[in-house]
Design a protein with these regions (language model features):
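P-loop NTP-binding core
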Residues: 2-14, 24-330
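Key DNA-contact positions within bacterial/archaeal DNA-binding proteins
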Residues: 20
Length: 330
């Protein structure tokens, strides 16, 4: 991701400045570009490190907060969960928050979406959870300052079996994350579409659960299973999630079946379904193929706009937990 560049207009937008204010900051020397100039006719561009330096110089760093653990999970695959979670995490970091992404899927798709080849990783979460390797030795940097990653690869495929005989096996991930409290503002966990001990760990560690779904009726089956699982954790292990956010992904309002499915979700899950949908957008796939989040690929795309709107809605809801008992039976 280190090749990502910001135009003056985009840098100003990310920093919450007008283009004129940005120009004035440049004149004062508060903002500088480290990107080599291509000549006097080439427009100024900035690297992600320039963005980080400018944010610090202009005192536009958001207040630090206690670690917020946010899990992206759906037992049904093919919902675009990883594209959403990686772009969400990138945008948080772009806004100046300290973010740790934890790739729980042995396929390593979240790692790839952030420009990291999981196959090359010397350590994964397996080492931290099973071998009790210090978590700071497992974390790797991405190209975005403030956005770090615990990568994943095929070594994670046996983690459920390795967890089975361990004491307090449901709490291993929560204990690992205690090691990074104070270092990060957000931990974004991207989980595989399955239920096992690793995902149980993820649920037990999470404050917030994000459930990306498609606007089709197959999504209801996966949601029912997931909500039953979460309710079981409340009853058996006394773990209550602060929030559950269902977000409709790849939505196409021109499809009758999509509109009907959305209406059904609104009926059965009114307290959990986000009002903002993520519209169908081919830029997600194109960005993933290049190993960058959608904000870096095309910040003006429908997908980027919708992820930002989801983030804004979520920030507005955090602080007012909605309990699972509010769900109407589907």
């Amino acid at each position: 991701m280190e090749q990502i560049r910001y135009s003056s207009r985009r840098l100003a937008e990310v920093l919450g400045l007008s283009v004129r204010e940005l120009a004035e900051a440049e004149e004062r020397g508060a903002i500088q570009s480290t990107v080599p100039s291509g000549g006097p006719t080439q427009k100024m561009s900035y690297s992600m490190r320039d963005l980080s330096s400018a944010r610090a110089a202009l005192n536009r760093v958001p207040p630090r907060r206690p670690l917020r653990r946010q899990l992206f999970l759906n037992f049904k695959g093919g919902t675009g969960k990883t594209s959403v979670s990686s772009s969400y995490a990138f945008r948080l970091a772009e806004m100046g928050h300290r973010v740790l992404v934890i790739d729980l899927d042995s396929q390593g798709h979240a790692s790839k979406c952030l420009g990291v080849c999981g196959e090359d990783a010397e350590r994964t979460l397996f080492d931290a959870i099973i071998k009790k390797t210090p978590v700071e030795t497992v974390i790797v940097k991405t190209g975005m300052p403030g956005l770090d990653l615990i990568p994943s690869n095929l070594t994670m495929s046996t983690i459920d079996l390795s967890l089975m005989p361990l004491a307090a096996r449901e709490f291993r991930l929560r204990n690992v994350l205690k090691e990074v409290e104070g270092t990060y503002d957000y931990a974004v966990l991207d989980a595989p579409p399955s239920f096992g001990l690793l995902n149980l760990n993820a649920l037990m560690a999470a404050h917030d659960l994000f459930v990306p779904v498609l606007a089709d009726f197959l999504s209801f089956h996966g949601l029912k299973l997931l909500f039953e699982t979460v309710q079981g954790l409340e009853e058996d292990l006394q773990h209550v999630l602060d929030h559950i956010f269902i977000v409709i992904n790849a939505y196409n309002a021109t499809y009758k079946i999509a509109k009907e499915a959305k209406e059904a979700l609104e009926k059965h899950y009114p307290d959990f379904l986000l009002k903002q949908v993520i519209r169908q957008c081919t830029k997600f796939a194109q960005a993933s193929s290049e190993g960058i989040p959608i904000f870096a690929y095309d910040s003006e795309s429908k997908g980027a706009q919708d992820i930002q709107a989801v983030l804004d809605e979520v920030q507005g809801r955090i602080g007012a937990p909605v309990r699972l008992k509010a769900v109407e039976s589907a």
